[in-house]
């Protein structure tokens, strides 16, 4: 069978034109802070010969412009995790962006239909599918509103409130659901299905936890940078302006997959007792002898007590303080000036410096302290997050530190730390429902918290699970009352407030687009349709009059 004929001169011209187009695109102010480690030629070679323009890229441009304005005004786009089209349409009236939470999808929208806690063990297309669900709803309600408005005169439209239903969506990419190729494909899914931005965290796939669970395992700094590069490369191949948010879970992380990256060395714990046996071998031996459960756990606890677990710089400082030196503080300063959270000093270099200062080696073994799964013990914290945030910044539009508490001082330390190296870096903040807000701060401070954070550079802030919690509260309250007072519960606590507050869903047929679809039917049947949904007899006409009992 003969091959399809192609004009190689035209092929070459098309390629060179694409390269020039990509180069011009990358010169736009949008990319002034973005570092790419590949060339325009690399991207052009990996593109299809058929150019596809993705609507989500327009949404990404819109989101970038929105955040630029917030950054300029020291304000923030603040939003929450949306569960469904009802929530998205109501949010659009008041908020300028939409969030899609992996946690919410895990519990309510897995494509396997199997609910789960936030372990990112749902199928890879789960969150992209939810994005598409909400994106299609946004497009539908935008079309519906547009037709409704254009059926009015210009004078009537000027008096009619307008809702921008096309609020940009930022979605949860978890850890990327695998290696680099998985991240490339996941990014493509998000672009195709309507996301304006995505966030990805530096936890290890397979052990990923909700940011407010224990047992988080980090990947090395460079491994996460590779993920960020993969996201940008995938978006570049698709010609998308997709925003990338780099999340770090290092503030509370306790484990690390590998010590290959010297930037992590400062935060790795090791045994300082030379008599400490290898923990993993000790645990394996105990299991082979039939020891399990609490007894096995007690072996690890006892080992930890005797091992003298410390960070290397702590071990060195202890040696100085316990030694016979007259200038201890000067020696400590000499060491910590070169070995600190942001110095990126390797353990090898730190050992050499300690030997010069002390005249001897400091015993420190991070291998014997490894967990039974092989992970290294890690002691994160705010400065660890700053280190990682600084490393990720050139490859991401926003940086997010997952935190254990809504601690303004900590948020300030992180913001100032990242901005010390990257002054124009945008930041994101999780206003998590996992925090006990009423214990953390009084109501007056809750009210100003978003504003205070925005002044530090947190341009995008979000309550991950507010969609879930508001639904739970509303349904629990209604179900309780309904069980006791029957239809009075619906009439007085649902329908009456809907009417009073002007919540358009009270006319759910109209909200669902029945009039819009009737218009389509009439358009294709010559203007008449006996099966129109909103014709004579529709019960929604009752809402044109004063509701009974009001």
Swiss-Prot record:
- Tell me the residue numbers annotated for binding Mg(2+): 172
Q: What is its EC number?
A: 4.1.3.1, 4.1.3.30
Q: List the disulfide bonds.
A: none
Q: Which SUPFAM superfamilies match?
A: Phosphoenolpyruvate/pyruvate domain
Give the taxonomic lineage as stored in the record.
Eukaryota, Fungi, Dikarya, Ascomycota, Saccharomycotina
Keywords annotated in UniProt: Glyoxylate bypass, Glyoxysome, Lyase, Magnesium, Metal-binding, Peroxisome, Tricarboxylic acid cycle
What protein name is recorded for this chain? Isocitrate lyase
**Entries under CDD domains matching the protein:** ICL_PEPM
- Which species is listed as the source? Debaryomyces hansenii (strain ATCC 36239 / CBS 767 / BCRC 21394 / JCM 1990 / NBRC 0083 / IGC 2968)
Q: Which GO terms describe its cellular component?
A: glyoxysome
User: Cellular location of this protein?
Assistant: Glyoxysome
Source taxon at top rank:
Eukaryota
Which pathway does UniProt place it in?
Answer: Carbohydrate metabolism; glyoxylate cycle; (S)-malate from isocitrate: step 1/2
The annotated active site, in chain numbering, is: 210 (proton acceptor)
Q: Which residues bind substrate?
A: 101-103, 211-212, 247, 430-434, 464
> What catalytic activity does the UniProt entry give for this protein?
D-threo-isocitrate = glyoxylate + succinate; (2S,3R)-3-hydroxybutane-1,2,3-tricarboxylate = pyruvate + succinate
Tell me a GO biological process for this protein: glyoxylate cycle
Family named by the database record: Belongs to the isocitrate lyase/PEP mutase superfamily. Isocitrate lyase family.
| UniProt keyword annotation of Zinc-finger present | no
Q: Which GO terms describe its molecular function?
A: isocitrate lyase activity; metal ion binding; methylisocitrate lyase activity
Q: What class of enzyme is it?
A: lyase
Q: What does this protein do?
A: Catalyzes the formation of succinate and glyoxylate from isocitrate, a key step of the glyoxylate cycle, which operates as an anaplerotic route for replenishing the tricarboxylic acid cycle. Required for growth on ethanol or acetate, but dispensable when fermentable carbon sources are available. Also acts on 2-methylisocitrate.
Cofactor requirement: Mg(2+)
Q: Which PANTHER family match?
A: BIFUNCTIONAL GLYOXYLATE CYCLE PROTEIN, ISOCITRATE LYASE/MALATE SYNTHASE
Its assembly, as annotated, is: Homotetramer.
């Amino acid at each position: 069978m003969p091959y399809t004929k192609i004009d190689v001169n035209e092929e070459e011209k098309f390629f060179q034109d694409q390269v020039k187009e990509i180069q011009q695109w990358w010169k736009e102010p949008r990319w002034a802070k973005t570092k790419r480690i590949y060339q325009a030629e690399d991207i052009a070679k990996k593109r299809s010969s058929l150019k596809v323009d993705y609507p989500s890229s327009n949404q990404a441009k819109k989101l970038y412009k929105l955040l630029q304005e917030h950054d300029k005004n020291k304000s923030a786009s603040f939003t929450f995790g949306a569960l469904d089209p009802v929530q998205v349409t109501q949010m659009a009236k008041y908020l300028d962006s939409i969030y899609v939470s992996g946690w919410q999808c895990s519990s309510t929208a897995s494509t396997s239909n199997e609910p789960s806690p936030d372990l990112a063990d749902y199928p890879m297309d789960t969150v992209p599918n939810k994005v598409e669900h909400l994106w299609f709803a946004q497009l539908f309600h935008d079309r519906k509103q547009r037709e409704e408005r254009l059926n009015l005169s210009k004078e009537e439209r000027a008096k009619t409130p307008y809702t921008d239903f096309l609020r940009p969506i930022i979605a949860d990419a978890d850890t990327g659901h695998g290696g680099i190729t998985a991240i490339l494909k996941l990014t493509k899914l998000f672009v195709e299905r309507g996301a304006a931005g995505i966030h990805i965290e530096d936890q290890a796939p397979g052990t990923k936890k909700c940011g407010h669970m224990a047992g988080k395992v980090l990947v090395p700094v460079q491994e996460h940078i590779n993920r960020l590069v993969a996201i940008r490369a995938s978006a570049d191949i698709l010609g998308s302006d997709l925003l990338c948010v780099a999340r770090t879970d290092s503030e509370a992380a306790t484990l690390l997959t590998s010590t290959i990256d010297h930037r992590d060395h400062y935060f790795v714990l090791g045994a300082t007792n030379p008599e400490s046996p290898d923990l993993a071998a000790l645990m394996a031996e105990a299991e082979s002898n039939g020891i399990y459960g609490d007894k096995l756990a007690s072996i690890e606890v006892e080992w930890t007590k005797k091992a003298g677990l410390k960070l290397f710089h702590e071990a060195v400082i202890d040696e100085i303080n316990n030694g016979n030196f007259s200038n201890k503080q000067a020696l400590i300063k000499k060491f910590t000036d070169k070995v600190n959270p942001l110095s990126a000093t390797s353990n090898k270099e730190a050992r050499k410096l300690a030997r010069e200062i002390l005249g001897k080696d400091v015993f420190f073994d991070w291998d014997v302290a490894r967990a039974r799964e092989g992970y290294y013990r890690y002691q994160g914290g705010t400065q660890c997050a700053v280190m990682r945030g600084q490393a990720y910044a050139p490859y991401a539009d926003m940086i997010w530190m997952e935190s254990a508490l809504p601690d303004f001082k900590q948020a300030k330390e992180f913001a100032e730390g990242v901005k010390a190296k990257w002054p124009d870096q945008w930041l994101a903040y999780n206003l998590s429902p996992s925090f006990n807000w009423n214990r953390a701060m009084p109501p007056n401070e809750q009210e100003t918290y978003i504003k205070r954070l925005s002044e530090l550079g947190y341009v995008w802030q979000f309550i991950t699970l507010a969609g879930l919690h508001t639904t739970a509260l509303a349904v629990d309250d209604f179900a309780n009352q309904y069980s006791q007072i029957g239809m009075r519960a619906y009439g007085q606590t649902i329908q009456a407030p809907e009417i009073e507050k002007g919540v358009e869903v009270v006319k759910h047929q109209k909200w669902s687009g029945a009039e819009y679809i009737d218009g389509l039917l009439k358009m294709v049947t010559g203007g008449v349709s006996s099966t129109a949904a909103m014709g004579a007899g529709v019960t929604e006409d009752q809402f044109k009059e004063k509701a009974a009992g009001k």
